[in-house]
């Protein structure tokens, strides 16, 4: 099990394959993705690498984190993430990961924070059909209707689909295909959509379920 990478979402575009078909892709950019710390069995009880990406202003970095970056001899990073790895895949502190970490055709799991939509009703949030347009219904056409409760159990069960805050949640999309990489510009092109807005930090790992396909 090897480390993933931290990348930043640039946006979406399309590319053409050898058959002349256009393929929608999400463009991710890797910016100074380096190992800033390691975790070992002897010291921490598990093996992992902590990666940092992007650039952070020194004034916006805490004193403790400035000390950690100084020990690692790397510039302050805007985003940190830890990846569990096997012992033989531990990387040296300061090692920089490039877009060539992944190969074209490889399947990856992508994790990001979805775009927040604010408070949304049941029709938009869960695809409810709403109430009838006529026949006595007024004002509440887009309501979710009854929540299914009576004297017994006398409550609304937890996780009942209702109106509420939509989006702004951490989501992992599995088995997305890497269409191509550009190591010179630090770009990874992934087929399809990736959760998050433009500029969002994205975690890209080797797919864990690819063997089952």
Swiss-Prot record:
SUPFAM superfamilies membership: Translation proteins
GO process annotations (BP): translation
N5-methylglutamine: residues bearing it: 151
Single GO term (MF): structural constituent of ribosome
Ribosomal protein keyword on record: yes
Pfam families membership: Ribosomal_L3
PTM info: Methylated by PrmB.
Parts forming coiled coils: none
PROSITE patterns: RIBOSOMAL_L3
GO CC, one annotated term: cytosolic large ribosomal subunit
Record keywords: Methylation, Ribonucleoprotein, Ribosomal protein, RNA-binding, rRNA-binding
Reported function: One of the primary rRNA binding proteins, it binds directly near the 3'-end of the 23S rRNA, where it nucleates assembly of the 50S subunit.
PANTHER family: 50S RIBOSOMAL PROTEIN L3 (PTHR11229), LARGE RIBOSOMAL SUBUNIT PROTEIN UL3C (PTHR11229:SF16)
Record's subunit section: Part of the 50S ribosomal subunit. Forms a cluster with proteins L14 and L19.
Record family assignment: Belongs to the universal ribosomal protein uL3 family.
Record protein name field: Large ribosomal subunit protein uL3
UniProt organism field: Rhizobium etli (strain CIAT 652)
Origin organism lineage: Bacteria, Pseudomonadati, Pseudomonadota, Alphaproteobacteria, Hyphomicrobiales
Gene (name only): rplC
């Amino acid at each position: 099990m090897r480390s993933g990478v931290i990348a930043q979402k640039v946006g979406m575009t399309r590319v053409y394959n050898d058959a002349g078909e256009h393929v929608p892709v999400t463009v991710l950019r890797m910016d100074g993705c380096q190992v800033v710390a390691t975790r070992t069995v002897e010291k921490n009880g598990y093996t992992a690498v902590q990666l940092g990406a992007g650039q952070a202003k020194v004034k916006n970095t805490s004193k403790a984190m400035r000390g950690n970056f100084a020990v690692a001899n790397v510039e302050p990073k805007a985003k940190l993430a830890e990846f569990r790895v096997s012992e033989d895949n531990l990387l040296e502190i300061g090692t920089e990961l490039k877009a060539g970490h992944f190969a074209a055709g490889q399947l990856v799991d992508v994790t990001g924070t979805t775009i927040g939509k604010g408070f949304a009703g049941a029709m938009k949030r869960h695809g409810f059909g709403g109430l009838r347009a006529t026949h006595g219904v007024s004002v509440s056409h887009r309501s979710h209707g009854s929540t299914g409760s009576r004297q017994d159990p006398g409550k609304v069960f937890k996780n009942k689909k209702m109106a509420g805050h939509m989006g702004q949640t951490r989501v992992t999309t599995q088995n997305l295909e890497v269409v191509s990489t550009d190591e010179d510009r630090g770009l990874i092109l992934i087929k399809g959509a990736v959760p998050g807005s433009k500029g969002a930090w994205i975690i890209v790992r080797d797919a864990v379920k690819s063997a089952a396909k």
